[in-house]
């Protein structure tokens, strides 16, 4: 029996101006409470979605994000609370922008591929340059074209980096270390990657041959959907000290942002795991509120196989972003007729938005080992954390937040408050407000392209028809999302970037 909207509201209360609590009972079997972070406009979107669902309207076939946060709170072994970040929107199993941690000491605790997502280690890398906007504006069309020519983009795009089956096995195991050995990365690139660009538990034998077949031709490709490479300029600096540590010292400085993931390989790893886990759930008598939350005990063979395969797909994504960094450096080199080194094309940082990792956190005053699922959310560790690079020990970890086509992106830093409230996690981007299908119905791709041209943004798109799905109108306002995290204290604004050229799948 479904409840009325007013009945649903009985389970929700506001903790402070940017945070709501979802009390136990909102959905069956909740082990812990849920919370979600919003400001006024984002709050309105969340409650509208719930209201529509209680009238029988579905969001693109998914449950409303609030319900999904509640269903995650009912998973075995979850600890502290199920957390929705300001960019949260309905997804497969977990909402995108929903993170949760599971107690590794609890034999019942599970791992759920729906808590990582199909694009394993979809993430963002930011490069800086010593160029100024005035250097790039006159040649931005050539630069956009050079990047479009160098980086293979689009749905079925194939890579230009030579790769045999043996190379793929090594890349899956070694991550950025493979790129380094093959000459596609600089030694310091690795220092500025989450996990140093290599998850050590990766086991290529846990990646099916079907997944490898999908991944082999796609390495060093951008893919379609919300993936992009953008030439950006620094629009505002909120934290000069943190910005300086990142090599950003003035407005107008040019950067490059690369947003991509593990392509078809990661998708197949997730699909394979979901099939195996359905069987494991029957065997181990695990019940969940939503079939999409298929999971397995962390300690089970299925749980371990998935974590090892997921880590390999994660490594593939880091190699992918490294390959695209190599191609970007070549494109800049060609246009500006000088070496990437002379252009200071260094990696500021590289973060993952879809991953599960074993981490140490303090919960109720006790140090615990947890499996932290971050889906559509970003690790944001505070200053002095042992897992962040030496360069950022005093500022906190850089967090890269991609906007949507034609809107701003942000660099944030991690905080101590985020460490206690959200397991050192913050938002990842704008978060969809319209489903892809709805975007295609409501928006015309030519209008979207014209609007970008009006903003003075050079654009190269492999599949124009996909542009509507990624139009700024399809998304929540990234500034709302970032400000909510800043005001709530779970991350701190450092730099704002605006695009001048976009390359898209």
Swiss-Prot record:
GMP binds at residues 226-230, 353-354, 402-405, 409, 428-431, 504. The keyword tRNA processing applies. Coiled coil: none annotated. Its main location: nucleus. Pfam families: RtcB (PF01139). Mn(2+) 2 binds at residues 122, 259, 353. The active site is at 428 (gmp-histidine intermediate). Keywords: Cytoplasm, GTP-binding, Ligase, Manganese, Metal-binding, Nucleotide-binding, Nucleus, tRNA processing. InterPro entries: RtcB (IPR001233), RtcB-like_sf (IPR036025), RtcB_euk (IPR027513). Binds 2 manganese ions per subunit. This is RNA-splicing ligase RtcB homolog. The gene is rtcb.
């Amino acid at each position: 029996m479904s409840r009325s909207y007013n009945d649903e509201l009985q389970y929700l209360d506001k903790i402070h101006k940017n945070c709501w609590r979802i009390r136990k009972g909102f959905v069956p079997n909740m082990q812990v409470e849920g919370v979600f972070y919003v400001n006024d406009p984002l709050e309105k979107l969340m409650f509208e979605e719930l209201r529509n669902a209680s009238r029988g309207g579905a969001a693109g076939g998914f449950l409303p994000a609030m319900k999904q946060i509640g269903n995650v709170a009912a998973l075995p072994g979850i600890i502290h609370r199920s957390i929705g970040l300001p960019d949260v929107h309905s997804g497969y199993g977990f909402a995108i922008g929903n993170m949760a941690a599971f107690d590794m000491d609890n034999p019942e605790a599970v791992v759920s591929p729906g808590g990582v997502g199909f694009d394993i280690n979809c993430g963002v890398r930011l490069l800086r340059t010593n160029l100024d906007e005035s250097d790039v504006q006159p040649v931005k069309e050539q630069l956009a074209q050079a990047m479009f020519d160098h980086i293979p983009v689009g749905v079925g795009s194939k890579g230009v980096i030579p790769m045999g089956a043996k190379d793929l096995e090594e890349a899956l195991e070694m991550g950025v270390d493979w790129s380094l050995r093959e000459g596609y990365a600089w030694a310091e690139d690795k220092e500025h990657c989450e996990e140093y660009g290599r998850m050590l538990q990766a086991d290529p034998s846990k990646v099916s041959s079907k997944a490898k077949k999908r991944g082999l031709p796609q390495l060093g490709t951008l893919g379609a959907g919300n993936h992009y490479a953008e030439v950006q300029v620094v629009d505002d600096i909120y934290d000069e000290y943190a910005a300086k540590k990142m090599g950003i010292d003035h407005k107008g400085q040019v950067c490059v942002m690369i947003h991509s993931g593990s392509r078809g390989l990661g998708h197949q790893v997730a699909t394979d795991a979901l099939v195996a886990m359905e069987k494991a759930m029957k065997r181990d008598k695990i019940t969940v509120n939503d079939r999409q939350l298929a999971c397995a005990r962390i300690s089970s063979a299925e749980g371990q196989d998935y974590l090892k395969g997921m880590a390999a797909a994660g490594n593939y994504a880091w190699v992918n972003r490294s390959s695209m960094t190599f191609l970007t450096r070549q494109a800049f080199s060609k246009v500006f007729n000088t070496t990437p080194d002379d252009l200071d094309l260094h990696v500021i940082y590289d973060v993952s938005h879809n991953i599960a990792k074993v981490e140490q956190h303090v919960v109720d005053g006790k140090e615990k080992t947890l499996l932290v699922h971050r889906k559509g959310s970003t690790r944001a560790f505070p200053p002095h954390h042992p897992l962040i690079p030496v360069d950022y020990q005093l500022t906190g970890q850089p967090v890269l937040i991609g906007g949507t086509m034609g809107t701003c992106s942000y660099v944030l830093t991690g905080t101590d408050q985020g460490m206690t409230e959200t397991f050192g996690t913050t938002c990842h981007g704008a978060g969809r407000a319209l489903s892809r299908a709805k975007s295609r119905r409501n928006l015309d791709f030519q209008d979207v392209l014209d609007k970008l041209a009006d903003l003075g943004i050079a654009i190269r798109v492999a599949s124009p028809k996909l542009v509507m799905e990624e139009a700024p109108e399809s998304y929540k306002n990234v500034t709302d999302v970032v400000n909510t995290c800043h005001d709530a204290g779970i991350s701190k604004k450092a730099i704002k970037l605006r695009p001048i050229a976009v390359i898209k799948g």
